[in-house]
């Protein structure tokens, strides 16, 4: 079982990676974190805080920086990055979907505060990734989930046939 986490270093991407790590530990699953780095848009990398204002833009440097962020949250996760010719959300989501086709995840963990909206903005990377029916999608909206009562492992479930 593999979990895929599109990762851009944002608060909600951190939350999605942390959540995937929790589920992976419980289910003995592998995690693949993927970052899409636009080659044409140095400003995008600066906006994501992948590159300092006085630092030269270099895809390898950005990939190394983001990989360290991933390892800090999910040391067991595999990391891969993809280059994109543009920073458009559509292109980034296309790259993520391509990786999903290669990795064949059971679940994609998306950190997004708008992926679950009934009307998904065209500019939403998460919305474009979430529409694929080849995998389940776990949308993470908060770093810590609300309190969930412990589930008894008695094996008795509502509606269970005996």
Where are the regions that the model predicts?
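Short, solvent-exposed amphipathic alpha-helices that sit
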Residues: 19, 57-70, 95
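Structural beta-alpha unit
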Residues: 71-108, 135, 144-147
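Short, well-ordered secondary-structure micro-motifs
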Residues: 16, 43-47, 90-94, 120-121, ...
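Intrinsically disordered or low-complexity boundary/linker segments at protein termini
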Residues: 1-14, 132-162
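Small/aliphatic-rich secondary-structure junction motif
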Residues: 2-47, 162
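Short, structured coil segments at secondary-structure junctions
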Residues: 27, 125, 132-134
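Glycine-rich, Arg-bearing micro-motifs that act as flexible, cationic patches
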Residues: 107-128, 146-147
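Acidic, proline/glycine-rich short linear motifs
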Residues: 37-61, 148-162
């Amino acid at each position: 079982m593999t979990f895929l986490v599109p990762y851009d270093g944002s608060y909600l991407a951190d939350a999605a990676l942390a959540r995937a790590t929790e589920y992976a530990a419980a289910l003995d699953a592998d995690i693949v974190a993927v970052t899409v780095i636009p080659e044409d848009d140095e400003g995008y990398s600066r906006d994501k805080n992948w590159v300092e204002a006085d630092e030269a833009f270099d895809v390898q440097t950005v990939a190394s920086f983001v990989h360290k962020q991933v390892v800090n949250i999910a040391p067991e996760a595999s990391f891969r990055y993809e280059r994109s010719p543009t920073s458009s959300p559509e292109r980034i989501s296309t790259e993520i979907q391509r990786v999903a086709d290669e990795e064949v995840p059971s679940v994609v963990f998306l950190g997004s505060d708008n992926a679950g909206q009934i009307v998904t903005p065209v500019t939403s990377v998460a919305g474009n990734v979430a529409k694929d029916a080849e995998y389940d999608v776990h949308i993470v909206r908060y770093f810590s989930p609300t309190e969930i009562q412990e589930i008894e492992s008695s094996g008795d479930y509502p509606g269970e046939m005996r």
